[in-house]
Amino acid sequence: MTFDATWLEAEGDRLLAFARASVHPDGGFAWLDEEGSPQLDRPAELWISCRMTHVFALAHLMGRRWAGELVDHGVAALAGRLRDHEHGGWWAAVDADGPVTRAKTP
């Protein structure tokens, strides 16, 4: 099986450009609609913030220097607003007022 490395890199960069819009201004990463617009009326979800932090860390390792800032943004949310500092673990989702559910990841 063969693949076109040029196409693969271009497609990866296209997907990363789409994902860059997911930065949530309150911390973490937002859900994106089909057009790539962040859905800021939805809470910041732990799984999305974890995934996007990982995606941008890989992008940074691939030489996309701009992605380092987004890794820092994600790690700050994971260590900050998504973390339950009183009992440990992470909240499944948070909005501007805090956790939207008592569901947590230990």
Q: In which residue ranges do the predicted regions lie?
A:
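Glycan-recognition and catalytic cores of secretory/periplasmic carbohydrate-active enzymes
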Residues: 1-106
